[in-house]
C-alpha cells in the first residue's frame, strides 16, 4: 500500500517558528521553537537528572493551557538561563499570557549535559536565548539547520564506557504531512549509549 505521508521540513509545520544560536568555539548552543499564538503542550519528563524549566505547567491538572516557546539548550543546568532570554525577547514583542500590565511568555526548557565537550565555562545564557528568538522570528528559516548547531552543538553519544569512546551527535528534526495535518519533531541527541540503525545494525 502506498504511503499517504509526505515528508516535509519541520519549518513547514504551521504556527511555529524555529531558530538556533550556535557558539562553535565553545561547543554549545540553544534551539528555540516559538509559537507566537500559543500552542497546547504536554510533558513527559524522564531521566535521572533532568534539567528543565516550567515543564510542570504543561501537566493537564494545571491552569496554563498554552506554551509560547520551547527552548532546548546545552550547558546542563546552567543552560536554563537561555530560557530567560527567550522570555524577555517574547515579552518585548507582546507575545505571552496576558496578565494585566504585561504578557508573561510561557517558555518551557530542557538542557543537555555538554560541559565535557567544549569550554565548560561558556554556557547558553540570556543573550543566547534572545539571539535564537530573533533568528526564529526575524529571519524565519524555511529549513531548520541540523547537525552540530543550536542545542546539538555539544551533543555526543556512546559515553557508556567514558568520554574516550564517545562520538559526535547533534540536532535533528523530521516532519510529515497527511493532508492538512502536519506533525514535526526536533531533538538534541545526547544519549549515553550508541545510536544504531535498526535496518543495518550499524
List each model region and its residues:
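Alpha/propeptide regions of enzymes that mature by internal proteolysis
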Residues: 1-202
